[in-house]
Amino acid sequence: RRENIQHLIGHPRFELIRHDIVHPIYLEVDQIYNMACPASPPAYQYNAIKTIKTSTVGMVNILGLAKRCKARVLQASTSEVYGDPEIHPQTEDYWGHVNPIGPRSCYDEGKRAAECLMMDYHRQNGVDVKIVRIFNTYGPRMALDDGRVISNFIKQALKGEGLTIYGQGSQT
């Protein structure tokens, strides 16, 4: 949201560019931080096709731009690339246990494909890529109705309700 960065507007070293990464963009950059995908299940399931296109077609466009400009790319990925893991905790070399056709697959598989594209661009074209797999983000502007575990816990606690833990409580 624009109000989250309002304090940066007008700074000489900051420029806000509103652009859908599914469409190529032509500009000069030296770093790209890709966080362009909804992470809340209701948000990414609302338009599943748009979600997977953002992760895949968007990543092709980002990597093409990075290759042309020799820019570094940081991808905000997700713990969802592990799916419903059989190993706890997961290490980076764990490939995951993912349902490729389930209702969440637009997000999970989109992020997995984006990581694949990044590594292929790195190996084939020397693009400098970094991937961070983020688990359970939270912060002062998070929506309490976004359907993720931290927001659900906070909402239940504020209402004085017990916290709902699904499964055995060993999930990471």
Please place each PLM-identified region on the residue numbering.
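N-terminal Rossmann-like NAD(P)+-binding domain of SDR-like oxidoreductases, especially those catalyzing
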Residues: 1-137, 157, 167-168
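Activation segment of eukaryotic-like protein kinases
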Residues: 152-158
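Substrate-binding strand-loop-helix patch
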Residues: 140-147, 169-172
